[in-house]
Amino acid sequence: MMWKMGPHFTTLLAMWLVCGSASHSPALDSDSHTGRKVPLVSPISSRSARYLRHTGRSGGVEKSTQEEPNPQPFQRRKSVPVLRLAHPTMRPPPSGINGVPVRPEVRPIARSSAREMVRDEGSSARTRMLRFPSGSSSPNILASFAGKNRVWVISAPHASEGYYRLMMSLLKDDVYCELAERHIQQIVLFHQAGEEGGKVRRITNEGQILEQPLDPNLIPKLMSFLKLEKGKFSMVLLKKTLQVEERYPYPVRLEAMYEVIDQGPIRRIEKIRQKGFVQKCKASGIEGHVVQEGNEGGGGAGGTGLGGDKRKEDPRRTQVHPTREAPRKQATSKAATPQPPPTPRATTLPPAPVTTATRATSRVVTIAARPTTTTAYPATQRPWTSRLHPFSVSHRPPATAEVTTARGPSVSEQLYPLPRKEQQREKPQATRRPSKATNYGSFTATPPPTLWEVSARVVGTSRFRDNRTDKREHGHQDPNAVPGPHKPVKGKLPKKKDRILSNEYEDKYDLSQPTSSQGEEERQVDSVPSQNAKESKKLEKLEKPEKEKKKKGKSAKQDKLLKSEKQAKKAEKKTKQEKDKNKKKKAGKTEQDDNQKPTAKHLAPSPKKSVADLLGSFEGKRRLLLITTPKAENNMYVQQRDEYLESFCKMATRRISVVTIFGPVNNSSMKIDHFQLDNEKPMRVVDDDDLVDQHLISELRKEYGMTYDDFFMVLTDVDLRVKQYYEVPIAMKSVFDLIDTFQSRIKDMEKQKKEGIACKEDKRQSLENFLSRFRWRRRLLVISAPNDEDWAYSQQLSALNGQACNFGLRHITILKLLGVGEEVGGVLELFPINGSSIVEREDVPAHLVKDIRNYFQVSPEYFSMLLVGKDGNVKSWYPSPMWSMVIVYDLIDSMQLRRQEMAIQQSLGMRCPEDEYAGYGYHSYHQGYQDGYQDDYRHHESYHHGYPY
């Protein structure tokens, strides 16, 4: 029975197949004439098409099944994705854009999660922007930057947060062209409860900033997506693929961010394509100008266009695929449309002066600090006569007015600048004369014979020096200089000596008051040096008339007494007696006046301290460190002062006194510091008046050859003989090593050893003194960890092994801070700058570890590493261990001061062995531990072989 049913079933199946093929044959015949192939739609494909229809991803099937030649269905697909299946009735042949037959294509189907939509790198940004709105209120705000821009996200609790304000202060007006050249766009998030907000800062090709407010509802989504921690400041740098390239828990300098970006291979292509971009951007003149924009949906894609470009972009996208040049031409033509309204300009112009003023202030600061970093130190030779530094006349009057108080008011009336030629010709005179300064205040007292001889010798030589140079110097010399030794005496001065000795002169020209005219002042100044010079001759001339007057007075007295005795009884001679009495009184007055003039001069105060007296108080007792500096704020002096103040105890055990002379040669002040032990009696060598005595200071300068206005330092032994000259600041360790070789010091050390005198640093070292030890001399690499068993800390230590030479040549000092709570400590590792592998280690006390962590705001709870430059500023933060020091070396070698060091080291042949990086260094780092650095690291190999060490 079953075998009979088999043929019937086969017959029915064959008939069904024939009928089915007959119904489709007309469609096949009609399509065969046109040469068009009809896609076979299977039940499986129809199901997938239905699935795509629901998910909105049916672009691949729709292309192969569209019917109309016009782009009308293409527009409909933008709004509502529709799936069209093949119909047997009407099939006109579709053509491409230029009449080319369209080839069907099938696209892979994937799930469209929110995270994959952000990282979708297969489809173009244009298609992605059609599917998702990308305005500042859209949840897909990051999608507008994908493939075109790098995104710099700054997250802070609120706008007044300290780190946020510090980071924004680093964003000066002149940095936005650099940011635009690297295709960087900014997103600022404020996430504190109740103050959620933010803004999107788009940087145009002209450096202009277009700010759009950010929807507060997007803040939590962006925070969770970027894994940003609430309540703390943090920054994230995203690649063009929207992958995280670097995280920064603290503000960093833009150079560190540029360094990270410039390491990528795509950045090299950008540099080639954008040559001269920064110059053109800055030439536009609108760099740093902020334009406030509203919240628009289509404003997300125009990353570097103007506001008009962003608003006009969606209508353009509904058309056929544009070429690369078309949007740019339209952008330039449409950018002028939002310009006519004056309101944006009125709102954006007021902030501009504020920002420029801030930038100017910061520049002044940097220029003032820069000479310390780029000072080319002079050679060790001492050209005594040629090193005459010019000094400004306008800076002298205030200091001179303080020192020479008697002449201050009158001298200040004669302020006039010297001509440049005259000033240059007078420099040798100005540096030679102060050494011969005499006490011009001794016109009321008779000075010792030694001073008479010196002043007479000065006057004797000046009589024959009335040449062109002396005339010029007398007419144009700085009026604030000490008048005594500087004014040469003219040949007519001896004729004025009688006038100088008279009482009328002293009455008219009171030294405590200023004179009425400039001519009288010059006459008074000229008379003072000649007075001291001629005192001996004056006294001799005075003695002769005094003796004659005395003889006449005695004879007159005798005659008058005889007459009074003989004619006492005669009344007619009373008138004669009265006349004689009057004559007696007159004679007595003249005798008293003549006798009082020399005695008054002898009763004047004693002369001021001389150089011999000053040095005599130090001889055999103290060693001297004499320093001259133009001003107290001089950078070289500040370095040297900080250096010896840190070694107080060592200075005291070596019995060193520091004599510091401030100011120019002709107007200086002095300060003396004695470093003594506790059991020594405090020393007081000079009075306060002697510290501003120009004669004493000039003689001290002359004694040790410190006769020019520059930093200079002299070291003496206890015999006060010069042992060493220094023209630049020097480390006190080398000074102490030199002193310990003195014979007198060897005896002192033996004596101190017997008495048990040792250096005990009982004072707690302050943070300022600790950091000033490294300023402009060393770079600090600070590593902080909760304990020495921390995994990140141990990984970082393994990366530091074998890097002593590189650290030394780059002047790096490692500071390790360990511990939490009260159990904290630290170690300071000093590497020699010559590249040797010897490391000096010093313990850091607990209180200093806490101060350093507080100063740099480093948490003791987790690992952290930061690089501090020679200027004391933090250059970069590293929240995770650096398995290779390449990034740190690249950052340091890009600094200007480091380039100067490299040039010096190259000339000296200082370099590190090439095999130092074997195992993990430059050549193996490109296998890397991070996806962002796996691109290409050949530039590290070129760095290794290209630099001289």
Curated annotation (Swiss-Prot):
Ranges of compositional bias, category Polar residues: 436-445
PTM notes: Phosphorylated.
Coiled coil (residue ranges): 554-587
Induction per the UniProt record: Up-regulated in adipose tissue of obese BRS-3-deficient mice.
Superkingdom of origin: Eukaryota
Cross-link Glycyl lysine isopeptide (Lys-Gly) (interchain with G-Cter in SUMO2): residue positions: K544, K547
Location of the region described as Disordered in the Swiss-Prot/TrEMBL record: 24-79, 112-132, 289-610
InterPro entries tied to this protein: DUF4174 (IPR025232)
Residue ranges, compositional bias (Low complexity): 345-380
Gene Ontology CC entries for this record: basement membrane; extracellular matrix; extracellular region; interstitial matrix
Biased composition (Gly residues): 295-307
Keyword list, A-Z: Coiled coil, Extracellular matrix, Glycoprotein, Isopeptide bond, Phosphoprotein, Secreted, Signal, Ubl conjugation
Similarity section: Belongs to the CCDC80 family.
Annotated function: Promotes cell adhesion and matrix assembly.
Protein name: Coiled-coil domain-containing protein 80
Gene that this sequence comes from: Ccdc80
